[in-house]
Amino acid sequence: TQWKTLVLSTGSGSQDIGYGAFFEEESASVEFTVKWLDLARVKVTKKDNNSKVNLSGAVFGIYLDSACKNLLIEMPATDSNGTSEVEFPKTQDTVYLKEISVPEGYKLNTESFHVKLETGKTTSVAVTNEEQKGKITIRKKGEVLTGVTGEEGNLTFVYGNADFAGAEYNIYAAEDIYSQDKVTKVHKAGDLVESLTTGEDGSAVSKELYLGKYKVVEQKAPENLVIGKTEQERTQFVTLSYAGQNVELSQGETTFTNARPEISVNVVKKSKHDDVTLEGATFGLYAEEDLTAADGKVLVEKGSLVERAVSDR
């Protein structure tokens, strides 16, 4: 008896080979049996959840179990048409489709899809992805009075940084901003996207924004702080970048720190008769009212001598 391997073709192109067992007897007659593979095909189409634009680069796995722990086959990445197909032996009636990785800019779809297989047929599944967006947090800080040192007539005020409510900001698109489908333009460069005012904690948080570069411009400073004189001094840039497929929101943050208003007092001592400036006169600067720290504590009482100064030439 002689054993051989035999390759068969159906002639249809749907399945080119089978496998079987056969034997050859001395009479030269041959008997064999062939078991054809039961093949099934799965096709997945990937689209943007909002624009419905086809998305390339998404990778899916086909699993044997609903928990998607037992991977049967990893599909090729979706092509420019947003599709991927795979053919495999049908060993059970139902498999489960789940996304493994997504195109950059999108959040992973964690849903698993129940796929009913049919021998010799294609089962199609459509899956969408939501693009990742982000939020910008603006913080406002400035100097506040916290203490005083020295003796009466030679007092030095101490300041520290604190959070400020009431600062007003505009957020503009710093560039043309597109949806992550790379087709849909959502903002033109220079578009006003949102206006915000800081709250009691000194912060303001934007709505969900598309990923991209934004310009934050201070419009109004809180009471007791000085706003920048030029737009450049009042402007900061924030870029919302892709934070990965498992992150819900990208985060951007910027802090504006403003100076406190400062004053100077100049006194000129002159002769009553000839308008000549006089050297050596001593002046005192007194508190017109109680001077309090940011927490309300009185640091210098009304009528106290804050500083002495002697006139020069």
Give the label of every model feature segment:
Residues T1-R313:
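Solvent-exposed loop/turn and edge beta-strand elements of beta-rich ligand-binding domains
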